[in-house]
């Protein structure tokens, strides 16, 4: 650790760590509240919605992939996926060339649920979105969080960022389709 100690002081390290911790906690609290309000009408919790979202964008993802990208333990991903299967939103499968891993895919009902939730996004207040509008007005776009992504890449690895980018590209590509589909009556 001699090299690390030469690059920064203990004071700098502690101030940085505490700053990140406090800002992350404050932001997460707002994100969590917004997310819970958005999905409440669908009787889902955040883990369940996240699994549906990941399954939608990473078609045929393994439980391990869902856990990794969902930043949850494999048993958490499996148990919540099981609940979603019982509700008819997910189906489990094994692959002939990979019997060790369990894969999840959305059912038609799961896909329809994701589409409906996306259509109803603006039916609830989103404090994080509202809090970012001044930056969008000033710079013409929402923040990219490139420095945060660099830190996440160093913590979780390139695979995590690749999955993140791939899923968001799929979301961008499919957004028009989501808007065109009829709303499901629940």
From Swiss-Prot:
UniProt key word Transcription regulation: yes
Keyword Protein biosynthesis attached: no
Keywords: DNA-binding, Repressor, Sporulation, Transcription, Transcription regulation
InterPro entries for the chain: HTH_MarR-typ, HTH_tscrpt_reg_Hpr, MarR/SlyA-like, Tscrpt_reg_MarR-type_CS, WH-like_DNA-bd_sf, WH_DNA-bd_sf
One Pfam family hit: MarR
Alphabetical list of SUPFAM superfamilies matching this protein: Winged helix' DNA-binding domain (SSF46785)
DNA-binding region(s), chain positions: 63-86
A single GO BP: negative regulation of DNA-templated transcription
Annotated ranges, domain HTH marR-type: 13-157
Gene Ontology molecular function, alphabetical: DNA binding; DNA-binding transcription factor activity
Domain of life: Bacteria
Function (record text): Negative regulator of protease production and sporulation.
NCBIfam families the record matches: PRK13777.1
HAMAP family in alphabetical order: HTH_type_Hpr
Subunit description: Homodimer.
PANTHER family per the UniProt record, alphabetical: DNA-BINDING TRANSCRIPTIONAL REPRESSOR SCOC, TRANSCRIPTIONAL REGULATOR, MARR FAMILY
Identification of the protein by name: HTH-type transcriptional regulator Hpr
Native source organism of the sequence: Lysinibacillus sphaericus (strain C3-41)
Lineage of producing organism: Bacteria, Bacillati, Bacillota, Bacilli, Bacillales
């Amino acid at each position: 650790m001699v090299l690390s100690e030469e690059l920064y002081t203990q004071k700098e390290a502690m101030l940085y760590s505490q700053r990140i911790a406090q800002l992350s906690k404050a932001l997460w609290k707002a994100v969590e509240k917004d997310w819970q309000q958005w999905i409440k009408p669908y009787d889902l919790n955040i883990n369940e919605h996240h699994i549906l979202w990941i399954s939608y964008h990473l078609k045929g993802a393994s439980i391990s992939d869902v856990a990794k990208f969902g930043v949850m333990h494999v048993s958490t991903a499996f148990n919540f996926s099981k609940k979603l299967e019982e509700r008819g939103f997910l189906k489990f499968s094994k692959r002939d060339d990979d019997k060790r891993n369990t894969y999840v895919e959305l059912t038609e009902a799961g896909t329809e649920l994701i589409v409906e939730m996306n259509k109803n996004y603006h039916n609830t207040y989103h404090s994080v979105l509202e809090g970012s509008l001044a930056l969008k007005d000033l710079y013409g776009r929402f923040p990219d969080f490139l420095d945060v992504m660099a830190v996440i890449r160093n913590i979780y690895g390139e695979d995590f960022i690749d999955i993140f980018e791939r899923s968001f590209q799929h979301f961008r590509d499919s957004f028009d389709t989501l808007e065109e589909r009829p709303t499901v009556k629940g």
